């Protein structure tokens, strides 16, 4: 799965909001409508999802110098491999390879290197 990347510097809309029918609530999404997730234990510079984890959980990335915009306040953090990842409340944001349609939240509650949670703004 290709990882969406902002190409221009400055501000860029990288997130939206949609209803996840399986969760019966609104979730934060990428610009393609795919649900965004956080991983328990990842916050303030601590990364657990690295290496092969990133195949199932692609990070939401932007180009260096880009200010991410969305329906909520977003930030950025530099990943261990040097890429810039979008954050919500200090937690890095990811999509899930098991979601292929808008509004799906198939990664909610999954446990591997921690527990994954759909972001509910």
Please provide the spans of the model-predicted regions:
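Compact beta-sheet-dominated domain cores in extracellular/mature segments
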Residues: 3-121
């Amino acid at each position: 799965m290709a990882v969406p990347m902002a190409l221009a510097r400055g501000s860029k809309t990288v997130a939206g909001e949609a209803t996840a029918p399986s969760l019966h609530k609104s979730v934060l999404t990428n610009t393609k409508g795919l649900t965004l997730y956080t991983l328990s234990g990842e916050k303030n510079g601590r990364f657990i999802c690295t290496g092969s984890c990133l195949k199932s959980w692609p990070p939401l990335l932007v180009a260096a110098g880009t200010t991410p915009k969305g329906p909520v306040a977003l930030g950025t953090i530099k990943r261990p491999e040097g890429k810039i990842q979008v954050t919500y409340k200090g937690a890095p944001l990811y999509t899930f390879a098991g979601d292929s349609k808008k509004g799906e939240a198939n990664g909610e509650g999954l446990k591997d290197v921690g527990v994954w949670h759909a972001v509910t703004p």
